[in-house]
């Protein structure tokens, strides 16, 4: 909501500066409490950065380009997730503090670029800054419409993704005796597929099929992944199944964000904030449930996540049929 009032650029700028300060503190930390304060500061200053960034992409995109641009944003994040630990590990070989100082430098360069180069998207897209009071009735109307359905689907998708990711490392070790290297290869394949599909295919596919059908296919694939994991027999089959997992994530996440952006009109910031809250809530609950179920049976989390994904598929199918 704050980014709807004062603009996306200030929120993103503050967030990047927060990353810089937090990483510097991490590099200089000599006690647990310094680390704790640095992490808390990072969360306080940068928690809205991803939300404002998604809103910025929504502001700056036409409806036809929105899914493609959301996909490219997701691909860029996947590249960072894949390369960050790699370079961090290399730099840590020289000094444990060096990865943090390097990250702080990169974050500060990004901060300077945002301040000096990045235009304010709300002004560019013609949306006025919202200085007036919060319109609860307008928000309620949106949440009872398509935006509410999309938020439910975002929760379900994040819930299933987090649940599957959280227990798969244990599952493949307990069932097949995977080495840490084999587990790493699985996640490298997932990251690679995410980058390629989000970066090059999600947008064009959405333009051809429509957002609802693409989301429907993606969530159904998530259910197939969960059930198929119970039937896997070794390394190759796990790679294939989690390749499909990456495809389903690449199709659903950016398309859901793009659909929410379309439904938001001038309130992209607050709805993206709700989406972030739904996603974060699912990431708290899903690992707890998956871990509890895993203690009962190692296949039970997959069956449960598959059933939840099927519920999401049904919700999406009804949404597709009833909302034009």
Locations of the language-model features?
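Paired small-residue
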Residues: 22, 33-41, 236-244
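Juxtamembrane intracellular "pre-TM" segments in multi-pass secondary transporters
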Residues: 119-151
């Amino acid at each position: 909501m704050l980014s709807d009032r004062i603009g996306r650029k200030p929120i993103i700028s503050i967030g990047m500066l927060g990353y810089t300060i937090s990483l510097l503190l991490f590099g200089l930390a000599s006690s647990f409490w310094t680390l704790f304060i640095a992490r808390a500061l990072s969360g306080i200053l940068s928690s809205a950065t991803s939300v404002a960034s998604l809103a910025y992409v929504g502001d700056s995109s036409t409806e036809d380009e929105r899914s493609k641009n959301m996909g490219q944003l997701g691909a860029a994040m996947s590249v960072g997730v894949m390369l960050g630990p790699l370079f961090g590990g290399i730099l840590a070989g020289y000094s444990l503090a060096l990865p943090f100082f390097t990250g702080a430098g990169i974050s500060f360069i990004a901060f300077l670029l945002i301040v000096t180069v990045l235009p304010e998207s709300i002004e560019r897209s013609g949306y006025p800054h919202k200085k007036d009071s919060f319109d609860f009735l307008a928000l309620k109307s949106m949440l009872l419409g398509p935006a509410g359905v999309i938020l439910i689907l975002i929760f379900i998708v994040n819930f299933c993704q987090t649940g599957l990711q959280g227990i798969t490392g244990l599952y493949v070790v307990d069932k097949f005796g995977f080495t840490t290297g084999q587990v790493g290869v699985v996640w490298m394949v997932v990251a690679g597929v995410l980058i390629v599909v989000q970066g090059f295919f999600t947008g064009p596919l959405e333009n051809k099929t429509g957002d609802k059908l693409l989301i429907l296919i993606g969530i159904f694939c998530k259910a197939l992944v969960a059930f198929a994991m119970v039937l896997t027999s070794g390394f190759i089959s796990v790679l294939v199944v989690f390749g499909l997992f990456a495809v389903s994530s690449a199709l659903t996440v950016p398309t859901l964000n793009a659909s929410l952006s379309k439904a938001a009109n001038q309130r992209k910031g607050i709805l993206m904030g709700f989406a972030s809250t739904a996603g974060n809530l699912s990431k708290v609950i899903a690992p707890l449930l998956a871990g509890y179920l895993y203690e009962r049976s190692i296949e039970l989390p997959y069956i449960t996540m598959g059933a939840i994904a099927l519920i999401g598929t049904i919700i999406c199918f009804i949404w597709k049929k009833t909302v034009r």
